[in-house]
Amino acid sequence: MDCIADLPGVMEVVMVHIVGTNKPASLRSDMVSSARTRIESEATLLNNLGIPSVRTEVMVHESPAAGIDDAANRNNSDIIVMGARGKSIIKGLRLGSVTQKVLHESKKNLLIMRGPIIETLSGEKFQKYCPLIFSRVLVPVDLTTESWTAVEQLAKIPDVQEIIAAFVISRGESEQEIERLKQQAGDELEKKCRQVPTKGAEIRWRILEGDLVTRINDYAQETDVSLVCTVPTEKGFFAEMLHGSFSCELARQATKPVLVIRRP
């Protein structure tokens, strides 16, 4: 809750709890009542932390992911914020099924916070991932216009201090071919970075080599970015995978918060 209150620009929060229809009918009433008591207590906490408007919804729905998306659309929300909450044996490695479904099916922007990180944050680290979550953002791009949507949207946010546009070369038949790709990509990336107007953010680019998802997440860790941002698209290197699978894999493996921006 503290982290939501410290995200920049938050004016209204709608807290949603879904009770699945797979729960025994005899228990649902008590589950709804218990959830409502808990969520209203958390709403009071957010109010006390400075959020101007906090509303709560507890509903019974056959699909938690669809229920969350319905609530977001009904309230005209700009973004859905969720935890990764996977149940992998290795904690934090996998997206929870609800988060994964929202990622695939919703048209809303989605911010996925890594539960194991947020739960242990304190002091300087807490400050990085909450009020300064947009301070240093890594964006995987290719040379298509569609993949630069995230860079253009982030550049409009005053809180963003640095944007790193990362281009990954995942294959090459020879060293000469790789060098040619690097030169071509470098020229295009430099040109595109210069063309994006910002609210003060510095935009720089990097060329990486290796598996797309693995290299992006490794570089995010190496450079200690505050956020990784992506736009699901069917063009460019994303076309080589099932639509949406790149964003899903990126979010699944990430140790950093992941922001998924939907195209208009």
Task: Please provide the spans of the model-predicted regions.
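General small-molecule cofactor/ligand-binding pocket signal
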Residues: 14-16, 55-59, 111, 164-166, ...
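Small/aliphatic-rich secondary-structure junction motif
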Residues: 1-29, 131-179, 194-201, 253
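Well-ordered alpha-helical segments embedded in enzymatic catalytic cores
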Residues: 67, 149-150, 188, 215
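Structural beta-alpha unit
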Residues: 44-80, 119-120, 197-228, 233-238
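Gly/Ser-rich helix-loop-strand patches that form or flank binding pockets
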Residues: 5-6, 72-122, 221-264
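Short, surface-exposed alpha-helical segments at coil->helix boundaries
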Residues: 29-40, 179-190
